[in-house]
Amino acid sequence: MNFGATFWGPMISFALFVWFTMKYVWPPIQTAMADRQKQIADGLAAGERGQKELDQAKSEVDKMLREAREQASQVIAQANKRQSELVEQAREEARQEAERVLAQARSEIDTEISQARDALRKEVVNLAVAGSSRILKREIDAKAHKDLIDDLVKQL
């Protein structure tokens, strides 16, 4: 065996293999690895951007919810205030109406009392006139006079 041919033959074959690999095989592998590395980096960056956007969207949603709750609270407060105003207004109107009805009833009662007094006065006057005319028609004597007055008192 020849040491030179045995040694140099595989060395030259290996060198040709390395040169061929470096020239034709390695550049596409490096390009594929670089592309893959770029895709992974882009994917990670997109994931981070997506996470930031998600966090931002969550904060905006929370802010919108807080604002909506505040607006709802304000609307409820305004509705409660309006309800209280309406109830108070209705109470005041009812009180005024009750006072008006009461005043009208008092006025009607006073009118009826006045009419009853007038009617009673007229009746008393009529009875007095009737009694006087009866007294004057009869003789004036004490017993007849007393009987006539008793009769008038019974009629009252």
Swiss-Prot record:
**Keyword NADP belongs to the record:** no
Task: State the GO CC annotations.
Answer: plasma membrane; proton-transporting ATP synthase complex
> Would I find Cell membrane among this entry's keywords?
yes
Q: Where does this one sit in the cell?
A: Cell inner membrane
Membrane topology of the entry: Single-pass membrane protein
Under the heading NCBIfam families, the entry gives:
ATP_synt_b, PRK05759.1-2
Tell me which stretches of the chain form a coiled coil. Answer: none
Q: Which InterPro entries match?
A: ATP_synth_B-like_membr_sf, ATP_synth_b/b'su_bac/chlpt, ATP_synth_F0_bsu_bac, ATP_synthase_B_chain
**Do you know which PANTHER family this protein is assigned to?**
ATP SYNTHASE SUBUNIT B (PTHR33445:SF1), ATP SYNTHASE SUBUNIT B', CHLOROPLASTIC (PTHR33445)
Spell out the subunit comment: F-type ATPases have 2 components, F(1) - the catalytic core - and F(0) - the membrane proton channel. F(1) has five subunits: alpha(3), beta(3), gamma(1), delta(1), epsilon(1). F(0) has three main subunits: a(1), b(2) and c(10-14). The alpha and beta chains form an alternating ring which encloses part of the gamma chain. F(1) is attached to F(0) by a central stalk formed by the gamma and epsilon chains, while a peripheral stalk is formed by the delta and b chains.
Q: What is the lineage of its organism?
A: Bacteria, Pseudomonadati, Pseudomonadota, Gammaproteobacteria, Chromatiales
Regions crossing the membrane: 4-26
Please identify the protein, giving its name as recorded. Answer: ATP synthase subunit b
Regarding protein family, the annotation reads: Belongs to the ATPase B chain family.
Please provide the record's keywords in A-Z order: ATP synthesis, Cell inner membrane, Cell membrane, CF(0), Hydrogen ion transport, Ion transport, Membrane, Transmembrane, Transmembrane helix, Transport
Protein purpose: F(1)F(0) ATP synthase produces ATP from ADP in the presence of a proton or sodium gradient. F-type ATPases consist of two structural domains, F(1) containing the extramembraneous catalytic core and F(0) containing the membrane proton channel, linked together by a central stalk and a peripheral stalk. During catalysis, ATP synthesis in the catalytic domain of F(1) is coupled via a rotary mechanism of the central stalk subunits to proton translocation. Component of the F(0) channel, it forms part of the peripheral stalk, linking F(1) to F(0).
